[in-house]
Design a protein with these regions (language model features):
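Electron-transfer interface patches adjacent to heme c in soluble/periplasmic c-type cytochromes
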Residues: 75-104, 127-135, 222-263, 274-287
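N-terminal export/targeting leaders of redox proteins
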Residues: 1-42
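Detector for the c-type heme attachment site
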Residues: 59-65, 110-111, 125, 145-146, ...
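The canonical Cys-X-X-Cys-His
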Residues: 47, 53-63, 105, 140, ...
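Electrostatic cytochrome c docking/interface patches
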Residues: 27-52, 171-200
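C-terminal capping alpha-helices of c-type cytochrome domains
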Residues: 16-26, 101-115, 128-154, 250-262, ...
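Short extracytoplasmic
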Residues: 39-76
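Extended, well-folded interaction surfaces typified by the phenylalanyl-tRNA synthetase beta subunit core
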Residues: 152-170
Length: 304
């Protein structure tokens, strides 16, 4: 009888633990079906700039063709956690997001939650996009709706064992994800505050220019100090004064427009795509990004 009692206790404890795990990893969407914050129509002209600042085409454009606005997805993003494929976000109603409402895009960007209520993998940088304004989400959706439909779904993700159960992405979110809008600093000017938003939210610069731990979370002490390319083909540079302290704000803004560095070099690898996008922004936005980057605290480059 005693052994049976212990068995019952173990079973109950396991059931309680499983229920707790299920509860804490539950996907939580920020916006409900009738949320009034998403009622207003967006501006596609403004959305085009959000699209450029967010570097959306670099991941979601269909590989192997020149049109960056054919958003069929499928680019292979290799990492220590598997190979991930950005999805089709074209207006195709079957294979893309043509049937989405604005709230679906808002929940994807600001919560990392799909319309079917599942977690997105953090290869989609929603930990940065979560700082976006709702107005920018509305404008982005308005622009996306002007783009052509592209048939065909992206190939499936191939995650490693750590992320093979998508529900467990909820644990990752508990550690590394927080929906926290950018707070303007009243002691700084409008340009600096605009730059903070572009760098920290839309541009998601820290997602590449930082080092990560074994679970894929950014190490706070390396934020913007550079990090290994997860595809294993290089190293993203330190963009704090420790590495580019002798660059002027004009140097940074020029790089974002032309890809040229002060030492007469040029950016390479994935940064070429970034420059393609930042070159589309108004000059005041590039100046704002430069002003914010110039203010970053000095951090030593971590060892590879």
């Amino acid at each position: 009888m005693r052994a049976r009692g212990i068995s019952v206790i173990v079973v109950v404890a396991c059931a309680v633990a499983a229920a707790a795990v299920w509860a804490v990893t539950e996907p939580r969407a920020a916006f409900s079906k009738d949320d009034p914050a998403l009622d207003q129509e967006g501006d596609p002209a403004k959305g085009r700039l959000v699209f450029a600042a967010g570097d959306c085409a670099s991941c979601h454009a269909r590989p192997g063709q020149p049109d960056r606005l054919r958003l069929g997805g499928g680019l292979a993003l290799s990492s220590p956690f598997g190979t991930f494929r950005p999805p089709n976000i074209s207006t195709d109603r079957i294979d893309g997001i043509g049937s989405w409402q604005t709230r679906d895009l808002a929940n994807a960007l600001l919560s990392g939650v799909s319309p079917t209520g599942t977690h997105y993998y953090p290869s989609f940088p929603y930990s940065s996009y979560a700082k976006m304004t709702v107005a920018d989400v509305r404008d982005l959706m308005a622009f996306l709706r002007t783009l052509p439909a592209v048939a065909g779904k992206a190939p499936p993700h191939i995650p490693t064992l750590l992320f093979s159960i998508r529900r467990f992405v909820g644990f990752w979110k508990l550690l590394y994800f927080q929906r926290q809008p950018i707070i303007a600093d009243p002691g700084r000017g409008d340009s600096w505050n605009r730059g903070q938003y572009l760098v920290e939210a839309l541009g998601h610069c820290a997602e590449c220019h930082s080092s990560r731990n074994v679970f894929g979370g950014i190490k706070p002490k390396t934020r913007f100090a550079g990090g290994k390319d997860p595809e294993g083909v290089g190293y993203f540079p330190n963009i704090t004064p420790a590495r580019i302290g002798d660059w002027t704000a004009s140097d940074i803004a020029e790089l974002l427009k032309t890809g040229n560095t002060p030492s007469h070099g040029r950016v390479g690898s994935s940064m070429t795509d970034v420059v393609t996008n930042t070159a589309m922004l108004p000059q005041e936005d590039r100046d704002a990004i430069a002003a914010y980057i110039k203010s970053l605290p000095t951090r030593p480059t971590p060892q590879p």
